[in-house]
Amino acid sequence: MPRYRLLVEYDGRPYAGFQAQATLPSVQGAIEAAVKAFCGQEVRIAAAGRTDTGVHATGQVVHVDLDKDWPAQTVFNALNAHLTREAVSILSAEVAEEGWHARFSANERRYLYRILNRRAPPALDKGRVWHMKKDLDHEAMHAAAQHLIGLHDFTTFRDMHCQSKSPVKTLDVARVRRVGEEIHLDFEARSFLHRQVRSMTGTLVEVGAGRWTVDDVKAALEARDRRECGPVAPADGLYLVGVGYGD
């Protein structure tokens, strides 16, 4: 049974997250329906990351096992043909190596959070950025983010309903930069806790707005207490932009 590796892009707004839902639209459900329309096979795909409601992706990776040995280009063309009414696009398709798994073979996940930092609200990117009217100090945000890098107990930045067995994670990259009218926050790690990126982002915005100091972020991290977290950033500006497999 050949396994296909798919690179996927989607707008998260129409979906109740990536994971299949019994009665609500999902990215997983859209892709699985496209597979069935293509070859008649009912499948269960696996993904590198199960993004929440409203979270977008430009670099999600999934795999699908098919009964027939189809050319990868045929899979690519067919799935996109059956996804035209969805906010989902297959960017590439290839036959996966033996033993490769979209989730368990991943050793790096990269997220981008976009903040539109201007007075005028977004017209074209509504629902794709977090709009902040107040000028944010991105340099202070970046300085505070450096306290988050490394191996830590991230209980403060962990959603109360997170199912991860341990709150301990290693954050490899935490970077804040200004790009025109936007502030971009980049985070990279092998894996993240539920809503960890949005929790860290919302907290760093408190620093940028002058309501928190750089050292307040360090203190919040060390408190290991969810009540010490800043406001959780909305899903709108969050993107899964890449997954690494050491290849």
Swiss-Prot record:
It is an enzyme of class 5 (isomerase). Substrate binds at Y111. Keywords: Isomerase, tRNA processing. One of its GO terms (biological process) is tRNA pseudouridine synthesis. The active site is at D52. It comes from the Bacteria. InterPro entries: PsdUridine_synth_cat_dom_sf (IPR020103), PsdUridine_synth_TruA (IPR001406), PsdUridine_synth_TruA_a/b_dom (IPR020097), PsdUridine_synth_TruA_C (IPR020095), TruA/RsuA/RluB/E/F_N (IPR020094). Its EC number is 5.4.99.12. CDD domains: PseudoU_synth_EcTruA. It catalyses: uridine(38/39/40) in tRNA = pseudouridine(38/39/40) in tRNA. GO terms for molecular function: RNA binding; tRNA pseudouridine(38-40) synthase activity. HAMAP family: TruA. Formation of pseudouridine at positions 38, 39 and 40 in the anticodon stem and loop of transfer RNAs. NCBIfam families: hisT_truA. Homodimer. Belongs to the tRNA pseudouridine synthase TruA family. PANTHER family: PSEUDOURIDYLATE SYNTHASE (PTHR11142), TRNA PSEUDOURIDINE SYNTHASE-LIKE 1 (PTHR11142:SF0). This is tRNA pseudouridine synthase A. It comes from Caulobacter vibrioides (strain NA1000 / CB15N) (Caulobacter crescentus).
